[in-house]
Amino acid sequence: GLEGFRPIASEAGYGRMVAEKITLSANRTLTLLNDCYNANPTSMYAALETLAATSASRRVALLGDMRELGAFSDSEHDALLTTLEMSSWLHLAILTGTEMQAAYKRHTQKHGTTSKVVYCPTNADCAGTLENRLQIGDVLLVKGSRGVRLEEALELLLHNTNNNGHGV
């Protein structure tokens, strides 16, 4: 459980993570780690460490671009994808944003595709994939730079599942 959860201290551009219980269609209650305000390599890895430390049987991450990295953007996004693929504790990573798309293309050209790391072009696609893949008891981390607007994917996920009961 998350009884001992404490958000990471507010330093170095992170610390806005909020943990909450959410309920999707079919009464699927899960834990949301919502940190969709900011993302840089330090805060991204710290958020993933928080996700890894949870006791959930399935850990899912919705990850958007890490913006404003300049010349380091490709290498940082590539390193993140390699980390995600190699993380035995991670069930699923859903990627979105232009930087993630480019890194995903490079990664799959080199290593092939897997069901563990997937790319979705829009927040609506992210919401649909989450609705189809999330299960009771999962922990979902949502993390990305502000410009990716991952809160829209969450709003769509919660709106669609709570209003029609059938998901997207």
Annotate each PLM feature.
Residues 1-168:
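ATP-dependent carboxylate-amine ligase
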